[in-house]
Structures are given as C-alpha cells and as structure tokens.
C-alpha cells in the first residue's frame, strides 16, 4: 500500500502558566532570528562573507554562556536550532529566486516554535513538549507514527495551533467514471461542464465595511496603550473569521469534486500575475491559487486525475460542439452564438466543456490547437479518454505515475 505525507493542524489551549512560558520562548526565538539575520546581512555587506546556520549555531553556544544572555538556556535547544535552520532555508529560497530576502520578525505577528524528536511526549493521544508539559488540544491526536517534528504557533489573534506531518496510507476511492471541466471566475467561483454554477461567496467583500470600521478604530488608538492592543486583537480575529470561512468553503468544494469525479480539468492560471492587475482584491478574495492547491493534493490522496490545461488556450472562444474559434470575444459578452453550427453558448459553461475536452486531448497527444474536426466527427472526451487508457494498458506505457495532477501544455 502506497503512503502519502499528510499534514495536521490542531487547535491548542495552553493554560496560563504555559502561555506565559511560551511568550518568553517566542520572544527568545524572535530575538535569535533578528540577531542572526542582522549579523548575516552585515557580514555580507561589509566583508562579502556568507555565513551559514552552522556558523551561527556555534555562536549560539557562546551566547548562552555570556552574561546577559543566560535566558537563552531556558528555551528548548531544539527550538533555537530549528530557528537557525529555518533561516537557512529562507536564504536558500532567496538565492534560488523563489522568495524574497528574509525579513525581521515583529512582536505582534505570527510566532512559532519547532520541536524535534519529542520522544515519549507522543503517547496515548497526549502531547507532551519539552519544558512545557502536557498540552491540551481541541481533539485527540490521530493514530499515526510519531512525527519527527512538531510546530507550535500563535497567530495574530492569540490562537495557538500544533502542526505536524505524518505518513499515512493512501485512501483511494473507487472511480465514479465521471469527467468534469472547471472554469474559475469572479461572478461564479466555479462553473462546471455539467452546467452547474457555484456562486462566489465573496467572504472578504461582505465583511469589508466592518473591517474598515475596525481598522479606523485601531488607527485612533494611542500606540502602546492597552486599548490599542485589545483593538488589534479584535481586528486580527475579524480577519481570521474571513480566512476560516473562505477555507471552509474551498474545502467543501474541492472535496466534493474529488469524490464525485474521476477526471477534473482546470486551467493553469497565473494567479500571481492576476493578483497584481485589475480586480486584484476580488481575485485574492476568490483564492484561485488555494483552490488549485487543494485539488492537487486531494487528487493525490483520493485518486482522481487532475488535468491542468495550458493557460494560453482560448477556452471561451472555441465552440464546444464544432470547435469553431471566434476571432474576438469581449469580456462583457456572457453569451454568444456559433456562426458555424448555430449553437448558443453560455460563456462559462462553454469554457468548462472546452477545458475538459482540451485536457483529455492534450493527455492523448492530440492538441486541439492543431486539430480541427467537424461537429459530426467530434470525438467525445469520455470516449477519447477511454481510448487513451486502453492504449496505455495494451502498450504497458503510462502517461502518469499515478493519481494526481498532470500539467499539460
């Protein structure tokens, strides 16, 4: 049985003494991160010297023995070591042009600690962390192998979470044999090739007036005052409610898709570029990237085939019946009639059907941009997919290693 790596995130409820202790630990790791980042930046700026986490780890041992820094010894050693390793990974991502330059951490932002090799602390559904004791969780620990690493975090609203990764057996479900194309949009979050339109909940837009009021109230509070801190937490909780509602809706949609369909075709959108253009707030509120991310890992978990169609394929301009392509289609034109076969199309439903057809054709090596067929000779995507899988079975060759996403184009 194949295994997959699954991540877990559980709500934690530390008591008063544990919260005070965690506050000191968060401050220590934040100080270590900022100090190490300042040393590395200054060393490269002045001497062109690139320091590593191992260099700073040796200095950390000396800092613990230096007068005025003995409080570092109160923090679990693994938490401090992992802090330096996280900074190493941040610099690796920067040098590989995946992320921007590491930044200094603020006191009011998200705080986290990482514990390695917790040993007997993982037993009988109870989590016991070094120097902290038993930590109360909102639910019992899953019955999985003891993880190598456990992270404890606190968000801006003051909520605590425990997260870890574990290998679990893949729970593949029997295929339904159904195929679907999914066209993402702002008026409707998702339009299926079956004709169903899923409305866009617009979680952020619906709460925007309340959020603006709370932000204005925060701006009027005096910096450093107790009332400002209370208002800051109120604003953070309001944003957390929006984020949780969005996540719940996306999980419900993606779970339904992977359970009801065996093949899912979506467009490989450049979400980052869309988020910088016109309507950026609405696009970020819709969370196209998060929806695609959930479909990717859930397709690997449960078995459906996820086809990602080339973003440059004009799915809205092709007739899904005869494959005729319009020269021009305005964005405000939601319906159009094919001049060749006379079919009246809903723009989004037609795009979803074309995404499914193009995904299956590209999987079969028959790109629709190079293939033109008449309406009577059009091969349905279900029949074409059956032909592809049958040819793979006869030849012993597979276009994919297993269930999961396949990027096309």
Where is each model-derived feature located?
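Positively charged, helix-rich recognition surfaces that bind polyanionic ligands
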Residues: 5-6, 16, 20, 78, ...
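Stable alpha-helical structural segments in soluble proteins, enriched in small hydrophobic residues
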Residues: 36, 83-94, 349-359
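Generic N-terminal simple sequence motifs
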Residues: 10, 87, 98, 376, ...
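Gly/serine-rich nucleotide phosphate-binding loop at the start of the catalytic core
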Residues: 1-79
């Amino acid at each position: 049985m194949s295994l997959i790596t699954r991540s877990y995130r559980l709500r934690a409820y530390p008591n008063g003494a544990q919260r005070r202790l965690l506050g000191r630990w968060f401050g220590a790791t934040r100080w270590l991160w900022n100090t190490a980042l300042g040393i590395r930046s200054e060393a490269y700026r002045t001497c062109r010297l690139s320091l590593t986490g191992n260099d700073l780890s040796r200095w950390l041992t000396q800092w613990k023995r230096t007068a005025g820094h003995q409080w570092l010894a109160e923090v679990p050693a693994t938490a401090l070591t992992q802090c330096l390793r996280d900074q190493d990974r941040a610099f690796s991502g920067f040098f590989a042009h995946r992320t921007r330059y590491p930044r200094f951490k603020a006191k009011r932002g998200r705080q986290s600690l990482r514990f390695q090799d917790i040993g007997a602390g993982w037993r009988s559904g109870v989590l016991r962390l070094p120097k902290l004791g038993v930590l109360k969780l909102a639910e019992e620990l899953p019955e999985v192998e003891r993880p190598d690493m456990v992270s404890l975090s606190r968000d801006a609203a003051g909520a605590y979470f425990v997260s870890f990764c574990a290998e679990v057996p893949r729970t593949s479900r029997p295929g339904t044999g159904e195929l679907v194309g999914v066209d993402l949009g702002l008026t409707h979050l998702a339009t299926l090739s079956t004709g169903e339109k899923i409305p866009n909940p617009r979680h952020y837009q619906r709460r925007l007036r309340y959020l603006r009021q709370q932000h204005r109230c925060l701006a009027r509070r005096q910096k450093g005052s107790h009332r400002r801190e209370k208002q800051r937490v109120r604003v953070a909780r309001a944003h957390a409610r929006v984020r949780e509602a969005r996540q719940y809706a996306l999980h419900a949609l993606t779970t339904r898709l992977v359970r009801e369909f065996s093949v899912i075709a979506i467009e490989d959108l450049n979400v980052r570029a869309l988020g910088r253009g016109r309507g950026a707030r609405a696009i970020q509120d819709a969370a196209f990237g998060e929806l695609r991310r959930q479909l990717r890992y859930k397709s690997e978990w449960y078995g459906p085939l996820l086809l990602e169609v080339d973003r440059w394929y004009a799915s809205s301009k092709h007739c899904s019946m005869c494959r005729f392509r319009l020269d021009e289609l305005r964005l405000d034109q939601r319906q159009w009639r094919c001049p060749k076969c006379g079919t009246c199309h809903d723009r989004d439903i037609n795009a979803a059907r074309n995404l499914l057809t193009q995904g299956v054709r590209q999987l079969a090596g028959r790109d629709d941009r190079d293939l033109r067929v008449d309406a009577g000779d059009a091969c349905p995507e279900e029949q074409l997919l059956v032909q592809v899988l049958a040819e793979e079975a006869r030849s012993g060759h597979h276009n994919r290693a297993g269930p999961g996403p396949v990027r096309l184009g």
